[in-house]
Amino acid sequence: MLPSAMYPELLADLVTDLPHAVRLQRLVSMLRTHFRCGAVALLRLEEDHLRPVAVDGLVRDALGRRFAVGLHPRLAAILARRGVTCFHHDSMLPDPYDGLIDEHVGEPLPVHDCMGTSLAVDGQPWGALTLDALAIGTFDAAAQAELQRLTVIVEAAIRTTRLEGEIRALQLARGTPEADEGTAQHGDIGGEIIGQSEAIANLLHELEVVADTDLPVLLLGETGVGKELFAHRLHRQSRRRAQPLVHVNCAALPESLAESELFGHARGAFSGATGERPGRFEAADGGTLFLDEVGELPLAIQAKLLRTLQNGEIQRLGSDRPRRVNVRVIAATNRNLREHVRDGSFRADLYHRLSVYPIPIPPLRERGNDVLLLAGRFLELNRARLGLRSLRLSGGAQDALRSYRWPGNVRELEHVISRAALRAVSRGAGRNDIVTLEPELLDLDGLEVPAAHHAGAGMASAFAAPALAAGITLRDAVEQTQRACIEQALKDQGGNWAQAARQLGIDASNLHKLARRLGCK
């Protein structure tokens, strides 16, 4: 039987108003203490994978991992039946947490005993609870019976959390102040947005507030912060969620085709226009149009976009007939649009239309331990991709990730983890090994050096300040430097534009566009 003190504590949490992350974390912590095991995890079933929502005893990146059920036979077996499933030390099935027990950081010790139970809420499958131990024989028949009795309390805690979330959502929709406290602290890692830092929690709360309006939103953030993911979240939480979200990468639109792509064209509008074609605005009618890299739009297109935002009408290229559209616009940029307004490359009136509700997205370096959760996600993806038994970070590697500045943000982190995993395999790591990534495999020290210093001696001179003629403007000086950098990168890469773009740290489409503007092609 459970100690008499544990039941009241578990039941008290069910009737106490707690942020859901706190409630579920307290639950798994109490279970781990009582069963005297190495780790406890509460996992939510989402389509074909399990997402950890609360863990105790696993490495810090565990909350960022996603466990594909089809690749983890123990998890599949737990989900396949109601009741407790136990795997003893002699089980031949691989454990998803091999090498991930936090008590032994840096020690690739396999799990010996494991038990778990599937969970259901309101009659529907919800996920699983798993308990793991390094000591053989931890989960005997008495422990399994105890977990069976506890399952109903775990399911009740999950149901309470769900109901409280629904209540808070209703309060938020009605503008009730009480909704703020619980919502801002949730540390939600739902969908593809992973993070529990204060910065990301505040951002998710702000998105939730503005999502239910039809205000234009301008997402501001550095390259690689995931602006598209936040745009998708805004749309999913809006009243337009059942209608399409249409994504337009403005930087990839050829200037000659931008108007046709956005607004459509009539038959005969230009050579090759053999029929009517609706544009992206019409495709998004009733829903949301996401204008990514909006700062790259040509001035002529900016004027037509402004008219559409003002009047709710579009006019196809080659047609005199206006068409009404009902579209919410979400725009995103990594540029300082105010500076572009000042230098005349972006319309002030369009800027004010788009930035009715500007939302800055924090860079990865300002998100604290979120870097480890995100790393966990990429570790699990690479583990599955490379067919490894386990892939984890050493303590030193975790410290290195936290201290690095991440100029390329989440995208750069993904590339760093993928490269490190491949290096480990190339150095002899086998499929049955528990692979631990050390700092030298991450090679973050080399990434700290600006591209100008490791692209060759010629590149260093390309980044040197240009000699300024009398009366030259700052803009002319900047363009002169950009032109020199592009020319040197192309020379270093033998004329390969894609490799030159990687050397310069920008998208290839942006490089082509910049080169055309500067007269380099």
Swiss-Prot record:
Record carries keyword Transcription: yes
Protein name per UniProt: Nitric oxide reductase transcription regulator NorR2
Positions carrying 4-aspartylphosphate: 56
Key words of the record: ATP-binding, DNA-binding, Nucleotide-binding, Phosphoprotein, Transcription, Transcription regulation, Two-component regulatory system
CDD domains recorded: AAA
GO BP field: denitrification pathway; phosphorelay signal transduction system; regulation of DNA-templated transcription
SUPFAM superfamilies per UniProt: GAF domain-like, Homeodomain-like, P-loop containing nucleoside triphosphate hydrolases
Record-linked InterPro entries: AAA+_ATPase, GAF, GAF-like_dom_sf, Homeodomain-like_sf, HTH_Fis, P-loop_NTPase, Sigma_54_int, Sigma_54_int_dom_ATP-bd_1
Record-linked Pfam families: GAF (PF01590), HTH_8 (PF02954), Sigma54_activat (PF00158)
Residue sites binding ATP per the record: 221-228, 293-302
Remarks, miscellaneous: There are two very similar, functionally redundant regulators in this bacterium, NorR1 and NorR2.
Residue ranges crossing the lipid bilayer per the database entry: none
Residue ranges of domain Sigma-54 factor interaction in the record: 193-422
Pathway(s) this gene product operates in, as recorded in its UniProt entry: Nitrogen metabolism; nitrate reduction (denitrification) [regulation]
Up-regulation conditions: By anaerobic growth in the presence of NO.
Organism the protein comes from: Cupriavidus necator (strain ATCC 17699 / DSM 428 / KCTC 22496 / NCIMB 10442 / H16 / Stanier 337) (Ralstonia eutropha)
DNA-binding region listed in the record: 497-516
UniProt function note: Required for the nitric oxide (NO) induced expression of NO reductase. Not required for expression of 2 other pathway members, nitrate reductase (nirS) and nitrous oxide reductase (nosZ).
GO molecular function: ATP binding; ATP hydrolysis activity; sequence-specific DNA binding
